[in-house]
């Protein structure tokens, strides 16, 4: 019986790891201390990077409204109490940016009754499969060769460059258009709430007039909210015998200026400016931008 429980535990850890390396995962921890009002955390038991993006100031002194946009990590591990918290947020829809493989491993979102779920998967450029093979190998040298000496950082820069593909742009653009026209709150998330969700939030905040440095700081705060959960995951990987050096995962677990810069440089190279990226890259016309700002800024 003990052997069966051990096997199940290892399988559970492996599922978490594989989903994690498809752009991070959430380890269930006690709610973190609430963050400052701008981009404040919504403390939950089953997700650690859930935030209302309201409170940020725009160039002209206005403020992004609270209760309109929530960014999050995966909602598959929410407790009943967590679901009740979200029920109090009057959600009009939830947008899931995860790939089907991630959903299969981590499970579907747990949502309040009646809240529509919209699947808009952002392709992970094969990262999920690649990491599955590397971690399952239990081969320290193979893991070092793939992730060490800048290998993990190279992988992440490739992920961020992929945010400019046609499929990714279509998903990001559709979500922003939904935010422009929804009367109520919208929650969007990926797995760890840091890369796809982080880039989308960065673009959204800049689109409504929040200064670039402020939008960047919001992006980087995922490191603070995720630190304890990510450390726990690395310890689980080591204890389960999958990696001798789980610190190789750190560049995959973190958000970094360099990763965001990869996407920003690419959009500037391809579109010339952030404004042109919004209109030509994401299909957000001037009328929609006006609606977006009116809906999200007060």
Model-derived features: where do they sit?
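Cys-dependent protein tyrosine phosphatase-like superfamily
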Residues: 2-186, 200-298
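Catalytic nucleophile loop of clan PA
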Residues: 189
């Amino acid at each position: 019986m003990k052997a069966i429980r051990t096997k199940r535990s290892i399988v559970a850890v492996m599922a978490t790891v594989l989903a994690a390396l498809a752009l991070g995962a959430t380890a269930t921890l006690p709610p973190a201390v609430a963050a400052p009002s701008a981009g404040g955390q919504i403390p939950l038991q089953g997700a650690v990077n859930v935030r209302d993006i309201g409170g940020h100031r725009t160039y002209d002194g206005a403020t992004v409204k609270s209760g309109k946009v929530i960014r999050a990590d995966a909602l598959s591990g929410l407790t009943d109490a967590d679901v009740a918290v979200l029920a109090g947020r009057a959600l009009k829809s939830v947008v899931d940016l995860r790939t089907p493989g991630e959903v299969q491993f981590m499970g579907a979102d747990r949502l309040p009754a009646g809240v529509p779920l919209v699947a808009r998967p952002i392709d992970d450029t094969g990262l999920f499969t690649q990491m599955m093979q590397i971690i399952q190998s239990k081969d320290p040298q193979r893991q070092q060769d793939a992730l060490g000496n800048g290998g993990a950082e190279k992988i992440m820069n490739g992920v961020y460059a992929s945010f400019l593909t046609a499929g990714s742009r279509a998903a990001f653009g559709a979500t922003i258009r939904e935010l422009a026209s929804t009367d109520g709150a919208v929650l969007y998330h990926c797995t760890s709430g840091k890369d796809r969700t982080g880039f989308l939030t960065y673009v959204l905040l800049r689109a409504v007039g929040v200064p670039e440095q402020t939008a960047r700081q919001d992006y980087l705060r995922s490191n603070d909210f995720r630190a304890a959960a990510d450390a726990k995951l690395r310890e689980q990987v080591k204890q389960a015998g999958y990696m001798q050096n789980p610190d190789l995962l750190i560049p995959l677990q973190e958000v970094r200026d360099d990763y965001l810069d990869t996407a920003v440089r690419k959009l500037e190279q391809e579109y010339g400016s952030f404004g042109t990226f919004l209109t030509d890259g994401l299909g957000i016309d001037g009328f929609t931008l006006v609606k977006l700002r009116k809906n999200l800024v007060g």
